[in-house]
Amino acid sequence: MHRTVKRILCGIGVALAILVIAAGGLYLTGYLQVYGLTSGYQYLDREERARIVFSRNKLRDIDETLDRVHREGKILCVNGAELRAALASKPKALVYIFTDGCTSSACLPLSTIGAYAHKIGAEPYYVAIDLTPGLLKRTEPILSIDYTHYGTKWHDSFYEAFIKDLTGRSTDEEHFNLVLFEKGRIVSIFSTEKLLQQP
């Protein structure tokens, strides 16, 4: 009886090891794509990568640059500090930090955020956390986090650093994905859940 159980457990262990090795191999060769672990840049093909523009701390006029990049069908990657500095000249700006393709109730459509921003007299800015092919199909001007600025491709690391640069806060302090600025000063930080609770 013990031998049978031992053989079954050994067989299960071998099967799991083979499965892990196979999944690792598929991931390393690019056949298995897991979004949310890294920036997503490595999953973009050559044409898609050519449509990603890294500002490299040279962002001067956010609206002019974002408009030009958007007309070219590209995405502008920025770091948190330069985005905050660029918003200093804006009377009121609402930054929505989102994950493309998210279906959670915490993720609202960009059109909903845009309508809310206009309702409160703010200019909306959409910042994608990860780079995905779907972002390139969006009709709105899209910003994304410049993971290269933070020296890592790992999602949690560059996201935390971006939030710290943009707001001076840690993602551990509270959950938020909306930041309201007035002339570069943070007026409010809140989540889409709180936005939905407003009358």
Question: What are the functions of these language-model segments?
Answer:
Residues 1-72:
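N-terminal targeting signals for export/organelle localization
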Residues 73-85:
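A short, well-structured juxtamembrane/interface segment
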Residues 83-113:
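Short active-site neighborhood of thiol/selenol oxidoreductases, capturing the structured segment around
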Residues 99-105, 131-133, 186-187, 194-195:
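Short acidic, S/G/P-rich loop/turn micro-motifs used as interaction or catalytic elements
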Residues 105-145:
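Structural microenvironment flanking redox-active thiols in thiol-disulfide oxidoreductases
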Residues 173-191:
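A short, hydrophobic beta-strand/beta-hairpin element that forms part of a small beta-sheet core
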